[in-house]
Amino acid sequence: KINKTIEAAAIVDRSFIDSDAWKAKVIEESKRETIEASERGSRIHDMLESCFKKELEPTGDDASIFHAVDALLKVNCGEQNWRSEEVVCNLQKGYGGMIDLVSDEWVIDFKTKEFTTGSKQLAYESMAYQLIAYERALPAPPKRIANIFISANNPGVVVFHEWNEADFNRYWTIFESSLTVWKNVKKYWPERHNKEEESSG
């Protein structure tokens, strides 16, 4: 969002408006660009889901994106039976989610953002907390986890980032601690409801 605000400030002409009006215009432009980026990311996710489910034959820029992602997966993961947008639940811990792409060996999450080849940092550790939560909600055996970064402004530019298995327990501790805080703030413990249902059943 900060980057979008900076970009908006760079393109909004301040020659003919006062300072307050210019600031308002920058904020308006920043919000518009943020919404557009979010919608573009959702559309790319939906397109990839349809392609991996073999419901769509992509064309144009979509074809460039899908074939780049597919090739990247083959290089880094080998041949896999991928399942797209799979819902998982950890009833014991009381959380769930939807995985972008999963197989018997891998959990993959897509991230769309504007970047070019050679961009310095795309992966941030907080992304691993989401992935390890998905991984711990799945049945054995343990799975490897990775993000695929998809350029929204350079179709076909994709980057694969696998997270180190040696850090999995630490990622899980951080996620579990954050989940506990969230539940206590919200006063919401779905796992207790699950136990009550099991007892009554």
Show where each model-derived region lies.
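Metal-dependent nuclease catalytic cores that hydrolyze phosphodiester bonds in DNA/RNA
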Residues: 1-96
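Short linear sequence elements within intrinsically disordered, low-complexity coil regions
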Residues: 27, 57, 71, 139, ...
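Mg2+/Mn2+-dependent nuclease catalytic core
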Residues: 82-187, 191-192
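Acidic, carboxylate-rich catalytic segments that either coordinate divalent cations
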Residues: 192-201
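General "foldedness" signal
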Residues: 56-62, 121, 159-161, 196
